[in-house]
């Protein structure tokens, strides 16, 4: 690739989130920052594609994704290729770092700010000497890890906490744990209020009413699969639509798929997600309550408030103190609470009534806060 003209206002984002039709925090904030600053150029480093793993699993779809893709006049996505496991030493990390450095050089990025969400890029970011912001969105120290993975993550995060120009967290729990040794910036999640309140047609793959809808990633550390199965067994007349990527163990996915009234609809384009929530008889949040979920600031909490649909949730962080239309109940009462709401005449009537306005933080507000942090870190890096 021929090096591009030099770009002075630039950002390298090392993210745990893929770049695709499913938009999460980092991707959304990048979109907002680019919209706010007409001079900003971004290199978005998506999770590395593990070549041996994908071949071993026979999954070829990710292998077909372009290594380098221009997705916007000022946004380029790099999908690094990972050929070696980290267990054999630093070679794998060095190979990934070289791919990022080469892409930044080819794009002509000058002294970019490095926004780290994937802590495995800690040594790369700090070795460059470029200003760095560490953005902690989940407490992966509390997730299911092997001892080797946990030790590596602890080392990477300790380096970032000690040497980053700023540390941003998205939840009060993360502010407490990561703020024990240094100052942190709390920037929670948000929502595109206009998108979620603008009426959309009923999605063609949404099952007929009555239907309970869950929107979000199905994940072993946060999704209560037995609770979903309990709901399906107790209410065979209720369709349950699970909208989002499926990262469950294969056995759990198969248990859900085996039930006729449970529909695994997979990931949906971000701009179509509101339609699933707007046409739900009820939105359900069957989350596990554990140390990992206590660290989260669920984006879906903001989306539920914006959409205004009746919602039943387990007492998970981010939902407990929201109030109507969010009904929080313990796990033992979850199925009964869903049944009572579905059977309520007001549930059907409410679908035709616009949601009462609620004050909900927007992604633009969160991006403005993030931009302030980044500008402060940039300024500090050039101060005499």
Placement of each model-derived feature along the sequence:
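Nucleotide-activated donor-binding/catalytic signature segment of Leloir-type glycosyltransferases, i.e.
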Residues: 250-274
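Membrane-proximal helix-turn-helix segments that form the acceptor-binding/catalytic region
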Residues: 101-105, 147-167
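Conserved donor-binding/catalytic core segment of Leloir-type glycosyltransferases
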Residues: 205-222, 228-232, 359
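Nucleotide-sugar-dependent
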Residues: 24, 220, 271-276, 283-303, ...
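A charged, aromatic-enriched C-terminal amphipathic alpha-helix characteristic of glycosyltransferases
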Residues: 346-379
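Glycosyltransferase donor-sugar binding loop
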Residues: 215, 239-251
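Carbohydrate-associated surface elements
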Residues: 173, 187-199
């Amino acid at each position: 690739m021929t090096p591009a003209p030099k770009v002075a206002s630039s950002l390298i984002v090392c993210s745990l989130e893929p770049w695709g039709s499913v938009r999460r925090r980092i991707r959304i904030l990048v979109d907002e920052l680019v919209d706010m600053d007409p001079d900003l150029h971004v290199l978005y480093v998506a999770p590395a594609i593990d070549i041996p793993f994908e071949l071993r699993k026979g999954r070829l779809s990710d292998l077909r994704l372009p290594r380098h893709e221009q997705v916007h006049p000022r946004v380029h996505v790099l999908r690094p290729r990972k050929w070696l496991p980290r267990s054999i030493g630093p070679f794998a990390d060095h190979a990934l770092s070289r791919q990022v450095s080469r892409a930044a050089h080819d794009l002509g990025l000058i002294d970019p700010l490095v926004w780290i969400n994937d802590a495995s890029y800690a040594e790369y970011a700090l070795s460059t000497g470029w200003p760095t912001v560490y953005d902690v969105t989940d407490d992966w120290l509390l997730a299911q890890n092997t001892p080797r993975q946990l030790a590596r993550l602890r080392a990477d995060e300790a380096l970032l906490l000690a040497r980053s120009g700023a540390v941003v967290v998205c939840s009060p729990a993360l502010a407490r744990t990561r703020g024990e040794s240094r100052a942190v910036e709390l920037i929670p999640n948000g929502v595109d209020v206009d998108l979620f309140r603008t009426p959309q047609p009923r999605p063609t793959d949404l099952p007929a009413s009555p239907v309970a809808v869950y929107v979000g990633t199905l994940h072993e550390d946060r999704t209560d699969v037995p609770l979903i199965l309990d709901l399906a067994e107790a209410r065979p007349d209720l369709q349950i639509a699970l909208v989002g990527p499926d990262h469950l163990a294969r056995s759990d996915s198969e248990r859900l798929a085996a039930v006729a009234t449970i529909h695994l609809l997979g990931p949906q384009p971000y701009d179509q997600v509101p339609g699933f929530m707007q046409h739900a008889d009820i939105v359900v949040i069957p989350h596990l309550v554990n140390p990992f979920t206590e660290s989260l600031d669920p984006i879906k909490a903001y989306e539920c408030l914006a959409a205004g649909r009746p919602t039943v949730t387990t007492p998970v962080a981010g939902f407990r103190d929201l109030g109507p239309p969010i009904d929080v109940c313990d796990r033992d009462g979850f199925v009964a609470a869903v049944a009572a709401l579905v059977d309520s005449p007001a549930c059907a009537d409410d679908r035709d009534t616009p949601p009462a306005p609620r004050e909900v933080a927007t992604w633009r507000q969160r991006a403005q806060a993030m931009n302030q942090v980044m500008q402060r870190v940039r300024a500090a890096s050039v101060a005499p």
